[in-house]
Amino acid sequence: MALDFLAGCAGGVAGVIVGHPFDTVKVRLQVQNTEKPQYRGTLHCFQSIIKQESVLGLYKGLGSPLMGLTFINALVFGVQGNTLRALGQDSPLNQFLAGAAAGAIQCVICCPMELAKTRLQLQAAGPARAYKGSLDCLVQIYRHEGLRGINRGMVSTLLRETPSFGVYFLTYDVLTRAMGCEPGDRLLVPKLLLAGGTSGITSWLSTYPMDVVKSRLQADGLQGTPRYRGIVDCMRQSYQAEGWQVFTRGLASTLLRAFPVNAATFATVTVVLTYIRGEEDQVDSEAAPGASTTPAGPALAQPSSL
C-alpha cells in the first residue's frame, strides 16, 4: 500500500507540472468580468499571460497544489483501495462508491489548497501583490477570515469531487477491463495512458458546472463586497447574467489539460511501480535460498494497483 502511495504522489507531481498552466487559464476565464472581458478565449488568455507576466505567470499558485499533493494522493489511493476491499467485490458500482469516498475525504486538503491557488492565479503581477506565495496566502486568509475563510467553497468542492472521483475510477476500471490490460502486455503503458486520460476527461465533464461555481465562490470578495450568498445564489446570478454558457466557461482549457495531465500521471506511476517492484523482486530472489542466479526482469504494474 505504501508503494502505491509513493507512486501516486510521484505521478501527481508530474501531472501538476504538466497541467498547471491550463488550470491558470481556466480559472482566469471562469472569473473574468463578462461586461469587459480581458481574454477572448483560451489561446488569447495563454498569449496574454505569457506576454504580460512571462511563462512563470502560467505557474502562479503552483506551490499550493504541490504542497498538498503528497497528502491528497495518500488519501485518494488509500481510501479508494481500503473502501473497495471493505465493500468486498470489485464491481463497477463499488469502484464508483470507493472513488466517491476518496474524493469526499480528500476535500479536507483540496479545498484550502485550491483556495490559495485560485487567489494566487488571479493576483496581478507587480510589487502590489497581496500574497507572497501559497503559505502566505493561507496565513493571511486565516488571520482575516478565520477557519471559515480557509474552508471557503468546501460544500461546492465536495459536490464536485465526490461524484467526479466516482466517475473517474469507474471509467478507468471499465476501460482497463475492456482493453484487456494485463501484465506483460507490450501495449500496457499506452493502454493505461489512454484509460487514465479518457477517465480524466469524463470525470471533468460530469461535474464541470460545479467547478465554475466553486471558483467563483472562492474568488468572491477579492475586489470588494462579496456578490454571492451561497451556491444556489451564485448559480442563479451567474445564469441570469450570462446564460447557461457560463457553466462551460474555461471548459476548453480544462479538457486540453485533462488528457496530458492524466497521461503524465499514469506514465510516472507505471514507471515508478515497475522500477521499484523490479528492484524488490531482484533483492528477494537473491536473498532466497536456492534462488536462481538469473535476475528477474521488472514486472509492469497491475492496473488495479494504480
UniProtKB/Swiss-Prot annotation:
It catalyses: L-lysine(out) + L-arginine(in) = L-lysine(in) + L-arginine(out); L-histidine(out) + L-arginine(in) = L-histidine(in) + L-arginine(out); L-ornithine(in) + L-arginine(out) = L-ornithine(out) + L-arginine(in); L-homoarginine(in) + L-arginine(out) = L-homoarginine(out) + L-arginine(in). InterPro entries: Mit_carrier, Mitochondrial_Carrier, Mitochondrial_sb/sol_carrier, Mt_carrier_dom_sf. Residues 283-306 are annotated as: Disordered. Pfam families: Mito_carr (PF00153). Its main location: mitochondrion. It is a multi-pass membrane protein. Residues 287-306 have a biased composition (Low complexity). Solcar repeats lie at residues 2-86, 90-178, 190-275. One of its GO terms (cellular component) is mitochondrial inner membrane. Keywords: Amino-acid transport, Membrane, Mitochondrion, Mitochondrion inner membrane, Repeat, Transmembrane, Transmembrane helix, Transport. One of its GO terms (biological process) is L-lysine transmembrane transport. Gene3D superfamilies: Mitochondrial carrier domain. It comes from the Eukaryota. One of its GO terms (molecular function) is basic amino acid transmembrane transporter activity. It is found in: Mitochondrion inner membrane. The chain crosses the membrane at residues 2-22, 61-81, 96-116, 153-172, 187-207, 255-275. Mitochondrial transporter of arginine, lysine, homoarginine, methylarginine and, to a much lesser extent, ornithine and histidine. Does not transport carnitine nor acylcarnitines. Functions by both counter-exchange and uniport mechanisms. Plays a physiological role in the import of basic amino acids into mitochondria for mitochondrial protein synthesis and amino acid degradation. Belongs to the mitochondrial carrier (TC 2.A.29) family. This is Mitochondrial basic amino acids transporter.
